[in-house]
Each structure stands twice: as structure tokens, then as C-alpha cells.
Design a protein with these regions (language model features):
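Alpha-helical scaffold segments
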Residues: 1-233
């Protein structure tokens, strides 16, 4: 069995700055990643240990073992890194989905801002406005993806977070919120009121309001949305 060259030694034989660069090298010698994972200093630093777990050359058994031990921040880093092994990203995402129900509100809020796409629908169903507000600032969240998430039943926390977000003046979002609101107002214990429609009505021009009103079922909401044009004799 061949041994790593001196340049591929582990701390303390090599300085830590060099070791951290080696963790990102695409072709480490056989056995080196396993040795790195056993370093006591690395075990204490999950955000560094994740570089071993996500390495494309990490053996499958090592990857699975490490990912099972990583905390959510390190898992989120793996799941969001396009350079990580695809299996590592998938396993990290699945682990985050398992952890979500037991995470604190503060942890959920932090994760929501950078969560991988497979978690978006799970986050969107969270009835906590602060978590939703963080999610709506996600740098990868686009208009099309957001509109797809806004479906009945619309919840008060969702409506309020949207109304306070950067999306509050986007016409496609306004149209989708009004449709979801229309189908949710009559549901038992919806917690919604006609007033939730106000910011979205203001976001639409008269022509868009006319079209939106034609698609609504609730008479009261339809009257609110419909532009009342004055007629001239």
C-alpha cells in the first residue's frame, strides 16, 4: 500500500492553512480523507469536517457517517454547495428535512434564508411570520418559484409576511395572493380577513384589477378588487 507523500501529511506535520487548502484538493491520496476525519481538532469543528463529508472522493461509508453527525449549519453548507458530491447534497438535504420539526424558531429563521430548494415548501408551511420573512429574502428565490408556492389555503402568517416583503409590488404575486385569498376566506378558522387583500389591490393597475376580479368567487372580495370607473354621460 502506498503512503501519502510528505506534502500530504496531516497536522501537526503540515501547517493548518496548508491542510485547509488540501481539504479542497480534487485528488487527495487514498486514505487521506479518512485520516483527516479522525483528527480531534477537525471533529470539534463541524464546518471544517463538512469538507471531508462533501468531498467528491470521500468513500460512501465515510460520507454517510460524517453527515449523520453534522449539525444543521454544516448540513446547510453541504446542501447548498454546488461543488459537493451530489450524494452528499442529497443526504444533507434529507437530514435537514428530518431536523426541521425539532429546530427552534431562531434556527429555522437562520436556515430559511439559505435553505436548499427541496426545503422551500416545508418552510412555506411554517406558521411563523419571522421565519417566512427570512425565507422571502432568500437570494435564490425567484418570482416563478414564489408564485408556485402561493396556493390555498393561504394562512395569515403567509399573507402578512408577503405584504411586508420585497415582493409586495410584484403584479404576478399580487394576482396569485388574491386568488389564494379568495379560496381561503371561507375556510373554517382561516384567520383571514378582507383587509389582507388591500396591499395586493394597490399593487395592481386598473386593467389588472379588472382581470383579477373576473377570476374571483367571493362577491365581497370581487367588489373590493374591481376598479370603480366613473362613467361620463
Amino acid at each position: 500500500m502506498s503512503h501519502p507523500s510528505p506534502s500530504w501529511a496531516l497536522p501537526p506535520e503540515v501547517p493548518w492553512p496548508r491542510f485547509l487548502r488540501l481539504l479542497r484538493h480534487p485528488e487527495p491520496p487514498r486514505g487521506w480523507l479518512e485520516g483527516a476525519a479522525e483528527l480531534p481538532e477537525l471533529k470539534k469543528r463541524p464546518l471544517l469536517l463538512r469538507w471531508v463529508a462533501q468531498h467528491p472522493k470521500a468513500p460512501a461509508h465515510l460520507r454517510t457517517s460524517l453527515l449523520a453527525r453534522l449539525p444543521w449549519r454544516a448540513l446547510a453548507a453541504v446542501a447548498g454547495d454546488a461543488a459537493a458530491h451530489p450524494q452528499a447534497r442529497q443526504q444533507a438535504t434529507e437530514k435537514l428535512q428530518q431536523l426541521w420539526p425539532v429546530m427552534t424558531i431562531g434556527e429555522r429563521r437562520s436556515l430559511a434564508l439559505h435553505a436548499p430548494r427541496p426545503l422551500w415548501s416545508l418552510i412555506w408551511r411554517t406558521p411563523v411570520a419571522s421565519v417566512l420573512a427570512a425565507f422571502l429574502q432568500h437570494p435564490m428565490l425567484g418570482l416563478e418559484a414564489l408564485v408556485a408556492l402561493i396556493q390555498p389555503p393561504l394562512r395569515p402568517a403567509q399573507a402578512e409576511a408577503l405584504a411586508a416583503s420585497r415582493w409586495r409590488e410584484a403584479e404576478p404575486v399580487a394576482e396569485q395572493v388574491l386568488q389564494a385569498l379568495d379560496r381561503s376566506l371561507q375556510l373554517p378558522d382561516s384567520g383571514l380577513a378582507l383587509g389582507h387583500a388591500a396591499p395586493w389591490i394597490r399593487a395592481l393597475g386598473d386593467d389588472a384589477r379588472l382581470l383579477a376580479a373576473s377570476r374571483l368567487v367571493s362577491p365581497a372580495l370581487r367588489r373590493m378588487v374591481h376598479p370603480r370607473r366613473e362613467t361620463v354621460d
